[in-house]
Amino acid sequence: MGMYYDFENADGFATGAIGQPGARTFYLQVRAEGRTVSIKCEKQQVAALAEYLRTMLEDMPDTGTEVDPVSSSLVNPVEQDFVLGSVGLGVDRPNMRMVIQLEEMILVDEDDDDIFDLLDDDDDEIDSTVVRVLVTPSQARAFCDTADLFLSAGRANCKWCGTPIDPSGHACPKFN
């Protein structure tokens, strides 16, 4: 059974990566009300979230409020609560907050024919964990800036084929 977290005022909304380039694990982290929720995600999900938040920020007034850098950084130890599935974004204009909803990805066994029975049975709902958090425009901006740092800290891309170059070398298909 999934959990539902509804945080009206986030103390921190962060992203980061653990591990070496090429083998990093990305996380989102929400800190509010004395609780920390760490969500494993893909690098592309962090990039897309930062991109959409930046687009939304264009329509929000700049409050000029500085955010403590700690609030946009992962707090260790990072203990994964769930794996990110879908993301929803919105704006709470009266309170000048951005609404971010992070939903757990439900993993199913594709080889199990019984999964179709489970999905058709109203008594056996599959509940995912959901985190709904409201962040200030300043917190969203800090998240985007932190995301940029981690996204650009990955492996360099080959100038001929565009694929990432591993520390051990690169067999470029354009030259093989």
Q: Model regions: which residues?
A:
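The feature marks the first
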Residues: 1-59
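Intrinsic, low-complexity N-terminal interaction/targeting segments
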Residues: 1-20, 26, 64-130
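Short, structured motif recognition centered on aromatic/hydrophobic residues
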Residues: 24-29, 49, 53, 98-100, ...
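Hydrophobic, ordered structural segments
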Residues: 34-37, 42-48, 56-58, 105-109, ...
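Generic structural detector for well-ordered beta-strands
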Residues: 40, 90, 132-134
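Short glycine-rich, low-complexity/disordered patches
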Residues: 59-77, 154-164
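Mixed-charge, glycine-accented linear interaction segment located at domain edges/termini
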Residues: 107-169, 173
